[in-house]
Amino acid sequence: MKKLRIGFVGCGQFCANFVPIFRNHPAVEYVAVCDKFRERAEKFKEEYNADKIFYTFDEMIASDEINSVAIFTQRDLHGVMAIAALKAGKHVYSAVPMALKVEEILEIVRIVKKTGLTYSMGETGVYRPSSIFCRKKMLTVNSKIWFMELCFSQLATEVFYC
């Protein structure tokens, strides 16, 4: 298996939850960081022992040092960044949402089909205790097939509607 050489863009609080997970995965051999705020990128490099800092997204996706990108920016940038990374030949992992415009979603799908690159939208809400509780509960109710429409919790402790 080819090792992942991953560049993280958007070094904010949410990204901080993912860098250590990727960093410690045996399939990952190289971690770079990128943020529009230089100080934040430098802090991430030091804190997570990143191999390199890129100061612009364009510089990062143009680099041969990485083969994949993890997008943790503002959600209105997810689609355009994923498209640019895929066009640059990079695999993409993105925080939700995939994009805000249907056209961007369709373009991501088109590029993935054409290139064979991997795109993964990192939906993590399905692992919340409240979501797990609802799925388990649905399996025990009258042996019927149930579909969860909404699961809302506060601090992942109380289930209000399932």
Tell what function each PLM region has.
Residues 1-48:
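N-terminal Rossmann-like dinucleotide-binding module
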Residues 22-23, 60, 138:
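Hydrophobic C-terminal alpha-helix "anchor/cap" residues
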Residues 28, 67, 90, 115-118:
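Short, well-ordered coil/turn segments that N-cap beta-strands
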Residues 32, 52, 67-68, 118, ...:
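Short, Asp-centered acidic motifs that coordinate Mg2+ and/or phosphate
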Residues 43-50, 111-115:
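Short, conserved SAM-binding/catalytic segment
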Residues 52-111:
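Beta-loop-alpha module in the N-terminal Rossmann-like domain of NAD(P)-dependent dehydrogenases
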Residues 94, 119-121:
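Hydrophobic residues in well-ordered beta-strands that form the structural core
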Residues 118, 125-162:
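Predominantly a Rossmann-like dinucleotide-binding segment in NAD(P)-dependent oxidoreductases
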